[in-house]
């Protein structure tokens, strides 16, 4: 299995849900979200390559896990 990058929103969303199960993803600032993603074990994306769109996709994937 390869290490996740910014394009792997579903995988990252699940990892964030597992790491922060009580955190409402919609209450997380993008600056914190970006840092938390880059600190995930195995994350191999370029920290400078994140965009608002990729962070939104990750946040929504995390929210889908959190709300269910």
Provide a role label for each language-model segment.
Residues 1-68:
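A charge-rich, low-complexity, intrinsically flexible signal that marks solvent-exposed coils, linkers
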């Amino acid at each position: 299995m390869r290490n996740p990058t910014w394009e792997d929103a579903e995988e990252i969303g699940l990892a964030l849900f597992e790491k922060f199960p009580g955190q409402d993803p919609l209450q997380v600032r993008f600056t914190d979200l970006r840092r938390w993603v880059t600190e995930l074990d195995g994350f191999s994306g370029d920290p400078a390559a994140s965009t608002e769109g990729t962070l939104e996709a990750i946040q929504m994937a995390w929210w889908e896990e959190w709300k269910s």
